Design a protein with these regions (language model features):
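Acidic, negatively charged sequence signal
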Residues: 1-89
Length: 89
């Protein structure tokens, strides 16, 4: 996974089912993108860890637009795997 994969990711949205607050998710995605960009440049400063991503919590939404939880959770699993690979190097 590369930083541009994170930057380009678009999550599905939900209004009637519980979702995740978009701002919370977007803030985490920006930290992940910055971390991956740092690894790509071999100069990651203050990287977010796989453990931090795995334990991230988001404000729930309901009856207003939020990101689809399954979309976000599936992508977070991919991010955790990618970060673990970088951390093992």
């Amino acid at each position: 996974m590369r930083s541009e994969d994170v930057a380009a990711k678009k999550f599905g949205t939900t209004r009637w089912r519980e979702g995740y607050e978009p701002q919370d998710v977007d803030e985490l995605m920006e930290r992940v993108r910055e971390t991956l960009a740092g690894f790509e440049r071999r100069r990651s400063i203050n990287p977010i860890t796989a453990a931090e991503v795995a334990s991230a919590l988001f404000t729930p939404t309901k009856f207003r637009e939020g990101y689809d939880q399954n979309d976000v959770d599936d992508f977070l699993d991919e991010i955790v795997a990618a970060l673990r690979e970088h951390e093992a190097r």
